Amino acid sequence: MITAEKKKKNKFLPNFDKQSIYSLRFDEMQNWLVEQGQQKFRAKQIFEWLYQKRVDSIDEMTNLSKDLRQLLKDNFTVTTLTTVVKQESKDGTIKFLFELQDGYTIETVLMRHDYGNSVCVTTQVGCRIGCTFCASTLGGLKRNLEAGEIVSQVLTVQKALDATEERVSQIVIMGIGEPFENYDEMMDFLRIVNDDNSLNIGARHITVSTSGIIPRIYDFADEDIQINFAVSLHAAKDEVRSRLMPINRAYNVEKLIEAIQYYQEKTNRRVTFEYGLFGGVNDQLEHARELAHLIKGLNCHVNLIPVNHVPERNYVKTAKNDIFKFEKELKRLGINATIRREQGSDIDAACGQLRAKERQVETR
């Protein structure tokens, strides 16, 4: 729930007259109801309408009194997203471009796997991290999303899957934006979708990825929720990583590894390192050896990513044969590594590409 204190702390949050009802955790809904002179058990009924029956309006909550429904309508909104574009790949990947209440646009992706359906969600409108290979940073950061706007992405995809009686089984927080720059809303989102009164998606089926905001890695290590953790690394040496990711100038590789060591000491959980391969930049065997040396001894997995071409960026994709060589070298050196399967290659699959095409919506 967005409080005055949260707004003061997070200047990039929106200032709507009504916040999304999906921004409330179950305990917050209970507390709010009590403050309004309502019975606490109504929270369970409201959450059932929102997350199990997945209604589109408060008026559909027919086991609530008229007065309570009006109270909810006076304080909250249910509809926060409008689908602007929906692109479907021949491999089943679906990319959504959603418009928010204030006209900004965000992307969400449904990816189909043998083991279930995964949704990649966005946490910010734009991004200020400035990774030089990413379309999401084009145009900078406009604002942070409310927790409810992140929840609504998952719910909208789930509603689309309801027609075929399928279920969202995994969530990855790897869409537009840096999740750790919208930390409190991200954590509320995680607690909401993980709650058994809500979507009840297991913590171990949710992954959050960061570019390396070190203070927040320490905070995340101290949380009481066992979410999977990934770090966008992309290079083992500061010179190369700073070229790809300017955030490295503030939080260098050495300090990043120290934070990850703390995370593992606290949680005893594996970390995934995401490593995008860029032709002639970080994809040689010497780079594989540098990477292996850096992360040796950590409980980790390396996810090698064949990069998507972004027209506004100059990087080129590494040849398939070189990707296999890179993976083989890591394995030879004792590092657990796999190559990420490419999905949605026939649509605007790179993070931020679809939104970049529609960005005139935001530059009114």
From Swiss-Prot:
Disulphide bridges: 120-351
EC number(s) reported in the record: 2.1.1.192
Co-factor requirement: [4Fe-4S] cluster
Catalytic center residues: 107 (proton acceptor), 351 (s-methylcysteine intermediate)
Major enzyme class: transferase
SUPFAM superfamilies: Radical SAM enzymes (SSF102114)
Amino acids binding S-adenosyl-L-methionine: 177-178, 209, 232-234, 308
Annotated catalysed reactions: adenosine(2503) in 23S rRNA + 2 reduced [2Fe-2S]-[ferredoxin] + 2 S-adenosyl-L-methionine = 2-methyladenosine(2503) in 23S rRNA + 5'-deoxyadenosine + L-methionine + 2 oxidized [2Fe-2S]-[ferredoxin] + S-adenosyl-L-homocysteine; adenosine(37) in tRNA + 2 reduced [2Fe-2S]-[ferredoxin] + 2 S-adenosyl-L-methionine = 2-methyladenosine(37) in tRNA + 5'-deoxyadenosine + L-methionine + 2 oxidized [2Fe-2S]-[ferredoxin] + S-adenosyl-L-homocysteine
Keyword field: 4Fe-4S, Antibiotic resistance, Cytoplasm, Disulfide bond, Iron, Iron-sulfur, Metal-binding, Methyltransferase, rRNA processing, S-adenosyl-L-methionine, Transferase, tRNA processing
Major subcellular location class: cytoplasm
GO CC aspect terms: cytoplasm
Domain of life: Bacteria
Localization annotation: Cytoplasm
InterPro entries linked: Aldolase_TIM, Methyltransferase_A, RlmN_N, RNA_MTrfase_RlmN, rRNA_lsu_MTrfase_RlmN/Cfr, rSAM
One annotated GO biological process: tRNA methylation
This protein's record includes keyword Transferase: yes
Gene3D superfamilies per UniProt: 1.10.150.530, Aldolase class I
Molecular function terms, GO-annotated: 4 iron, 4 sulfur cluster binding; metal ion binding; rRNA (adenine(2503)-C2-)-methyltransferase activity; rRNA binding; tRNA (adenine(37)-C2)-methyltransferase activity; tRNA binding
Residues annotated as domain Radical SAM core: 113-346
Cofactor: record remark: Binds 1 [4Fe-4S] cluster. The cluster is coordinated with 3 cysteines and an exchangeable S-adenosyl-L-methionine.
Annotated positions binding [4Fe-4S] cluster: 127, 131, 134
Further details from the record: Reaction proceeds by a ping-pong mechanism involving intermediate methylation of a conserved cysteine residue.
Protein purpose: Specifically methylates position 2 of adenine 2503 in 23S rRNA and position 2 of adenine 37 in tRNAs. Confers resistance to some classes of antibiotics.
Sequence similarity: Belongs to the radical SAM superfamily. RlmN family.
Name under which the protein is recorded: Probable dual-specificity RNA methyltransferase RlmN
Name of the gene encoding the protein in the UniProt record: rlmN
